[in-house]
Amino acid sequence: MRTAAGAVSPDSRPETRRQTRKNEEAAWGPRVCRAEREDNRKCPPSILKRSRPEHHRPEAKPQRTSRRVWFREPPAVTVHYIADKNATATVRVPGRPRPHGGSLLLQLCVCVLLVLALGLYCGRAKPVATALEDLRARLLGLVLHLRHVALTCWRGLLRL
């Protein structure tokens, strides 16, 4: 049997909807209404937007509710659709940064030429000049050989 003090205590009463909501707020934090959320702008608005409600007329048919969906793609990834029979989506990912100094071979050639020019300037011109003449002769022979190979390939392609 319950006593009068036990019946009045809050533990003995069954939970109402209002008490349940208070318990949820304590557990999950306060519920924020939509107007407060839009003013605050901390939470993004819903992506499902309803169209403006029309005035209800008794003779008019009920109109279907249309929804507009707003999507925002991240700026780092852009999706491009290929205009082909099969419309597949490809993802473009930013590539590796390229060096601004040019190719490594070009840089090495510039360094070699600078060393040779420094050698000529310092007075050891005779051995360096002989080496440069030999290098020039070998490069000329290589260029002539490459030209001969290219012309032979071209003639072979014209015969086909």
Curated annotation (Swiss-Prot):
It is found in: Cell membrane. Disulfide bonds: none annotated. The chain crosses the membrane at residues 101-121. The keyword 4Fe-4S does not apply. InterPro entries: DUF4658 (IPR028114). Residues 1-69 are annotated as: Disordered. Residues 12-25, 33-42 have a biased composition (Basic and acidic residues). Keywords: Cell membrane, Membrane, Transmembrane, Transmembrane helix. This is Nutritionally-regulated adipose and cardiac enriched protein homolog. It comes from Homo sapiens.
